From Swiss-Prot:
Residues 1054-1111 are annotated as: BAG-similar domain, required and sufficient for interaction with UBL4A. PROSITE patterns: UBIQUITIN_1 (PS00299), UBIQUITIN_2 (PS50053). Residues 95-108, 238-247, 403-412, 564-581, 999-1016, 1062-1072 have a biased composition (Low complexity). The lineage of its organism: Eukaryota, Metazoa, Chordata, Craniata, Vertebrata. This is Large proline-rich protein BAG6. Residues 1018-1128 are annotated as: Sufficient for the delivery of client proteins to the endoplasmic reticulum. A motif (Nuclear localization site) lies at residues 1008-1050.
Length: 1128
């Protein structure tokens, strides 16, 4: 980090020192102070800038704490970096090396930099710069103490960016009013630190917490900027507006989301009110500006040696006026992008010309006393041959960095089609085929949760982005930080990376996602792929290492906002891994990976490099925008299952597993099975037209992962397996060893195999539709299935069916448990439906693994797994009567069972995110109802004909269900990851488990003898009791109330139902011996008449006890008389 250029001139003055102060948030400020100033005076000098009282400051240089009574010159700190810490460090700290791209944050004391001359490496940023937009209400202690930080997320309507801009402006106006009040009422009480957003009439409908701070909690640059009138700031913002929109103007009217709660765009009258209030503030500020000019004009020579009070007053004025100017400038820049298209039909509303991402710079959002680390990525513009590069936003961004309003409203897309049909204002937009492609990635490197989603916005008839599956709770030990939420249409996290690509060259390779471009030459321009891959991977990977508060939503087509409450507490590192669409795919939880391989990475970068390719959505399609929120480096592993999942804009997808990608039109929902990709697919192996070669794809992913995981000790270019990666992080050596506690049973062993052979790059490739990792794993899979699946038998069709029946039948209890609490369609046997469906799917997968030997092994296997997942979802949705909420309840119930022992808030967040993504998946389901009707089984239907061997196996399975349950059911204390590894089997049936219980109950003899409402309760008790150890003879209530020591001695006591055992125990207790031999006594006691007498006596004793026991209630035990009546 380098000081501002303006400081170089003052460095020559021998009587002054240039000191760089680095704070805990990794920001560096440059101060020019007198060489004779002592440490105490220096602390007072910088106190207002760093928002830390001088008495709490600790300055550290070369490992030593600077003493207050010594002079700075004695420590030789000129031009050096001093580290500043508080006496009690804040709860959430940013690693010191995490922010490498930040520049000097403050101007010099002698003179600020001239306006507009800010280089890329010297961007100005401070904590209050963008602390105004945030979704959810934060419940934070005011005293700075923190345990878990909870986000209270309510149902937030979709917000619009113009509304966000006005809200930001109003909050900054409030801050300016506070500063003016402090200047007008000298020595008055300090203004409030933050205003509850709910009190703002503008945001009353939305529960959007907009944290506003005064300069007290702001890192205001003590060496203030040069005086600059608000009008100048406005002019600068206006002058720079055209140059700051490399990505093109935004539409006058954003496309409304499918939900009813459309964005609430503000009217021009509201804009006028805000401008009038700004005008009033400027008039109030004028007298202080005059004094500000006078003080600064004489600052170079004024002698304050005998006028300490005057110096403090002037310094206070400089700080407050400078802060007011900064807020005023931010306000003007935030408002300067608002436009009103007069060509639209009334009522007209405001829209924005460019998103805030073009202004954003790293900062720290701080509310109450807990700083929340936020980084907003810089804007990177890529240009191609033959195109005019747009101006770089970094070099021209106004100093206030208004984009610090880290929110990009529902139209966080940079380009969107105008619904009114009027041309959007601003710079003339390029032709439809050359609209910029924008990639936004929000990443948090230490959060224990992962949220990733993507939306490629296309024409109105196109389905929205297929949601990704949230992953299990992950996070490095020691981080209990705020986690993110997804509120579609109102992303609260600042965008990490914005790569704007204007007017891409026509020679770029084609990709299946963009509009067709005449003359596109697939394969052309590949010579620059190597350097481009290096640039993209290095850029994204480096920027992803910056922590960011996550809350990014998909624009337009996002699912309805149903944010969850989430909290992350420090704890052990849980390591959840999902093997992606691996051979065990059908047994994986359906929602997590329903759309794996939906979108190839070529489409992601294709959007960046330019539109081209057959099968595009047509000329009416607008520029796709991809939004990815990615918190958590460890979570990145499991987050791979969610990465880049969006709908294909072309007809059934180009990737090898066509089934997952939802077709663009309803009539295509009955798309042919994956084996026959549509006409768009031209490359061998069933792959669709790829705009980028596999080598380029792999190099980019490898580069990103290397940069991303570098902090976790991953070697550059390493192909470390997932198992090795997790074992290295956790310090355990048996996480993925077959037979270990965390990986029992067939599916656990299969997961172990995949994790030991797949690297994270392989998983990313699989999720983008590249089957090469599966192709490479063919020998190991075949050997594994032969040993663990067939038990060494020959892979004949009969043996495969028998093994499949044995395996899937063991899942019956899980299917029954999953559907025990939902309403199934009348007459549907949900258990049989799921079991037989799984048998058929897994049978085809196993047969393919055992018999396929050609080069199409991997592509077909990936296709089968994805097809099975989508059909499983469609089938269970049909069995549940089309009730998406019921299906979500089944899946979330399974998640909760697998996540016992995990932080409940994380589980709640996970289930809510799953519901959001499931809804979008189901809305664009590529499998039609006709395709799954053949799997539906009705109550009373004859059983499906099976070979004789499976029937025998079924009998043996039913007689000994315990081993299967033991292998497939996660213990209550398992981690989410272990549960995930074992949970997949039940989850696929997860679509309709409650119905299974209901249907099964009707076939059980006891079900008819109890009220219907008791059936699910009893079934649940039965399931839970089967999983616990046998209880001692005494009642649970009696034992639970007994002292532990006595309970231990009482184990096994109680009445014996067998007379021989009762007599034998009584004889031993009394020390008596039978007159005859023990065998003779046993034979006598087993005589029928003796047994009957004993039975009658036992019944009589119990009846007497029931009659005399005052605690016995016949109403509570209505069936007791059946067991102990006179007549058996």
């Amino acid at each position: 980090m380098e000081p501002n250029d303006s400081t170089s001139t003052t460095m020559e003055e021998p009587e002054s020192l240039e000191v760089l102060v680095k704070t805990l948030d990794s920001q560096t400020r440059t101060f020019i102070v007198g060489a004779q100033m002592n440490v105490k005076e220096f602390k007072e000098h910088i106190a207002a800038s760093v928002s830390i009282p001088s008495e709490k400051q600790r300055l550290i240089y070369q490992g030593r704490v600077l003493q207050d009574d010594k002079k700075l010159q004695e420590y030789n700190v000129g031009g050096k970096v001093i580290h500043l810490v508080e006496r009690a460090p804040p709860q959430t700290q940013l690693p010191s090396g995490a922010s490498s791209g930040t520049g000097s944050a403050s101007a010099t004391h002698g003179g600020g930099p001239p306006p507009g001359t800010r280089g890329p490496g010297a961007s100005v940023h401070d904590r209050n710069a963008n602390s105004y937009v945030m979704v959810g209400t934060f419940n934070l202690p005011s005293d700075g103490s923190a345990v878990d930080v909870h986000i209270n997320m309510e149902q937030a309507p979709i917000q619009s960016e113009p509304r966000v801009r006005l809200v930001m402006a109003q909050h900054m106006i409030r801050d300016i009013q506070t500063l003016l009040s402090r200047m007008e009422c000298r020595g008055g009480s300090q203004a409030q630190h933050s205003q509850p957003p709910s009190q703002m009439p503008t945001v009353a409908p939305e529960p959007v917490a907009l944290s506003s701070q005064t300069s007290e909690s702001v890192e205001s640059e003590v060496p203030p900027r040069e005086p600059m009138a608000a009008e100048e700031v406005e002019e600068r913002a206006s002058a720079q507006s055209p140059g700051l929109s490399p990505s093109g103007p935004a539409p006058a009217g954003p496309t409304p989301a499918p939900e009813t709660n459309a964005p609430n765009h503000p009217s021009p009258a509201e804009y006028v009110e805000v401008l009038q209030e700004l005008q009033r503030l400027e008039s109030r500020l004028q007298p202080f500006l005059q004094r500000y000019y006078e003080v600064l004009g004489a600052a170079a020579t004024t002698d304050y040696n005998n006028n300490q009070e005057g110096r403090e007053e002037d310094q206070r004025l400089i700080n407050l006026v400078g802060e007011s100017l900064r807020l005023l400038g931010n306000t003007f820049v935030a408002l300067s992008d608002l436009r009103c298209n007069l060509a639209c039909a009334p009522p007209r509303h405001l829209h924005v010309v460019r998103p805030m991402s073009h202004y954003t710079t790293p900062m720290v959002l701080q509310q109450a006393a807990i700083p929340i680390q936020i980084n907003v990525g810089t804007t990177v513009t890529m240009t191609g041959n033959g195109t005019r590069p747009p101006p770089t936003p970094n070099a021209e961004a106004p100093p206030p960095g208004p984009g610090q309003a880290s929110s990009l409203a529902p139209s966080s897309t940079t380009v969107e089609s105008s619904t009114e049909g009027a041309p959007p204002p601003g710079p003339a937009p390029p032709p439809a085929a050359s609209h910029p492609r924008v990639i936004r990635i929000s990443h948090q490197s230490v959060e224990p949760v992962v949220m990733m989603h993507m939306n490629i916005q296309d024409s109105g008839t196109q389905p929205g982005g297929v949601p990704s599956a949230p992953t299990g709770p992950l996070g490095p030990t020691g981080h209990g930080q705020t986690l993110g939420q997804q509120v579609p249409g109102f992303p609260t996290a600042p965008t990490r990376v914005v790569i704007a690509r204007p007017t891409p060259p026509q020679s770029r390779p084609s990709h299946p996602g963009g509009p067709p471009v005449s003359g596109a030459l697939p394969g052309a321009g590949l010579g620059t792929n190597a350097s481009l891959a290096q640039m993209v991977s290095g850029l994204v990977g480096q920027l992803l290492m910056q922590p960011v508060l996550v809350a990014q939503g998909t624009p337009g087509m996002a699912p309805p906002p149903a944010p969850a409450t989430a909290s992350a507490s420090a704890g052990t590192t849980n390591t959840a891994t999902t093997a992606g669409p691996a051979p065990g795919g059908p047994a994986q939880p359906p929602p997590p990976q329903p759309s794996a391989s939906d979108l190839q990475f070529s489409q992601l970068l294709g959007n960046l490099l330019g539109p081209a390719g057959p099968g595009a959505g047509g000329p009416g399609m607008t520029s796709p925008t991809i939004t990815v929120a990615m918190p958590g480096v460890p979570a990145f592993l499991q987050g791979m299952t969610d990465f880049l999942q969006a709908t294909q804009t072309a007809a059934p997808p180009a990737p090898p597993p066509p089934p997952p990608p939802p077709p663009p039109a309803p009539e295509q929902q009955t798309a042919p099975p994956p084996g026959s990709p549509p006409g768009g697919a031209g490359s061998p192996g069933g792959l669709g037209p790829e705009s980028l070669p596999l080598e380029f794809f792999t190099s980019v992913v490898q580069g990103v992962l290397s940069s991303l995981l570098g902090s976790l000790g991953a070697r550059a270019g390493s192909s470390e397996s997932i198992a090795a990666f997790i074992q290295r992080l956790s310090g355990s050596s048996n996480i993925f060893e077959p037979g270990a506690d965390g990986a029992l049973g067939f599916f656990g062993a299969l997961l172990s195999l995949l994790c030991q052979n797949f690297s994270m790059v392989d998983v990313v490739m699989l999720l983008h539709g590249h089957f090469q990792p599966l192709q490479r794993l063919q020998p190991q899979l075949r050997s594994f299935f032969h040993q663990h699946y067939l038990g060494g038998q020959e892979p004949t069709p009969g043996n495969i069916r028998t093994a499949t029946h044995t395996l899937i039948t063991g899942l019956e209890e899980y299917v029954r448990e999953s559907f025990s609490l939902v309403q199934v369609q009348p007459g549907v046997d949900i258990i049989r439906t799921n079991l037989e469906f799984l048998q058929e799917q897994f049978n085809s997968i196993a047969a393919h693994v055992m018999h396929c030997t050609d080069s199409g092994f991997g592509a077909r296997l990936l296709e089968l797994c994805n097809q099975g997942l989508f059909e499983c979802l469609a089938l269970n949705l049909h069995c549940l009567g089309g009730q998406q909420m019921e299906l979500a309840a089944v899946i979330n119930g399974r998640i909760r069972r697998m996540s016992r022992g995990v932080n409940p808030s994380l589980v709640s967040w996970l289930t809510t995110m799953m519901g959001l993504r499931l809804q979008v998946v189901l809305e664009h389901m590529p499998v039609g109802p006709d395709a799954i009707l053949r799997y539906v089984r009705r109550v009373g239907d004859p059983p499906q004909p099976l070979p004789e061997e499976p029937m025998e196996v079924q009998g043996s399975e039913r007689t000994s269900p315990e081993p299967q349950r033991e292998n497939a059911s996660p213990a209550p204390g398992t981690t989410a990851e272990e549960a995930m590894s074992r949970g997949p089997p039940p989850a696929p049936e997860g679509g309709s488990r409650d119905e299974q219980d209901g249907a099964a109950a009707e076939t059980e003899p006891w079900a008819a003898a109890v009220p219907p409402e008791w059936v699910p309760i009893i079934q649940q008790d039965i399931q839970s009791q089967r999983k616990v150890k046998p209880q001692p003879p005494l009642s649970d209530a009696y034992l639970s109330g007994m002292p532990a020591k006595r309970r231990k001695t009482m184990q096994g006591e109680g009445p014996q139902l067998l007379l021989s055992e009762a007599v034998s125990r009584a004889a031993k207790a009394a020390g008596a011996r039978p007159l005859t031999s023990p065998e003779s006594l046993s034979r006598d006691l087993e005589a029928p008449e003796v047994q009957e007498s004993y039975r009658q006596q036992l019944r009589a004793d119990i009846q007497k006890r029931l009659q005399e026991d005052p605690n016995y209630s016949p109403q509570r035990f209505p069936n007791a008389h059946r067991a102990f009546a006179e007549d058996p």
